[in-house]
Amino acid sequence: MKRIFLLIATNLAVLLVASIVMSILGVNTSTMGGLLVFAAIFGFGGAFISLAISKWMAKKTMGCEVITTPRDSTERWLLDTVARQAQQAGIKMPEVAIYQSPEMNAFATGPSKDNSLVAVSTGLLYGMSQDEVEGVLAHEVSHVANGDMVTLTLIQGVVNTFVIFAARVVAGIINNFVSSNDEEGEGLGMFAYMAVVFVLDMLFGILASIIVAYFSRIREYRADEGAARLAGKHKMIAALERLRQGPESSAMPAQMSAFGINGKRSMAELMMSHPPLEKRIAALQTR
């Protein structure tokens, strides 16, 4: 329900902002070229703004406490492990943080390979063995090294542009059809047109989510493979086995869970950002 509400709120915000900007700037979206430019600005603009503030947003949303000076041997080990893996992967040392949560999870975020954050929950840090935690950390470092944040941002920008463009093209076709069958030729009217655009945004948005989730699952397999190289296949498999025994991940917002170790489970696998743990384990075992 929360995710549906956020989707509705986001689409309403896009429509409102788009209408205001078009009025102020006099943007003409009656032509395909003008509409495509408008769609790309909002589609890619929103995606890259989210990427630019991703570290700040993660820290605020999750209550992450960045480790600058280790307070105990566990925090020292955590920093040393990430530093070693980052060096192996050829990236700049990420910021390392801990957030309070009983669930076993971790995530990576940040606008670039050299400006990233790796965060682990207290539930994971103290509920797993060091070998298992090392596998999880290697998975997150691999996300950073593979450039997954930027890659998925570009994909998100493309599908956002498609949603905005396609919804308005179809709404225009519907408006022209209604106008041609209306004696007064008035078409849908402003409010009816906006309602049609909103519904189409939602429908195309679902299709876009399936596309983004597909690419996210591919990146998860790649991050698992990278973790196997950095920490050893047995440690990554052990971490996934441990996660499989635990409860479903639920507390992490969608924008962070896409790069987490343990994603939400769903009856519709098409909408999952992570492959089922069983498939990830099997993929590693057959490497």
Curated annotation (Swiss-Prot):
Q: What is this protein called?
A: Protease HtpX
Q: Name one GO cellular component term.
A: plasma membrane
Task: Look up keyword Hydrolase and say if it applies.
Answer: yes
- Cystine links in this protein are none
Active site per the UniProt annotation: 140
Which membrane topology describes this protein? Answer: Multi-pass membrane protein
The organism is Shewanella sp. (strain ANA-3)
Which compartments is it annotated to reside in? Cell inner membrane
**What gene is behind this protein?**
htpX
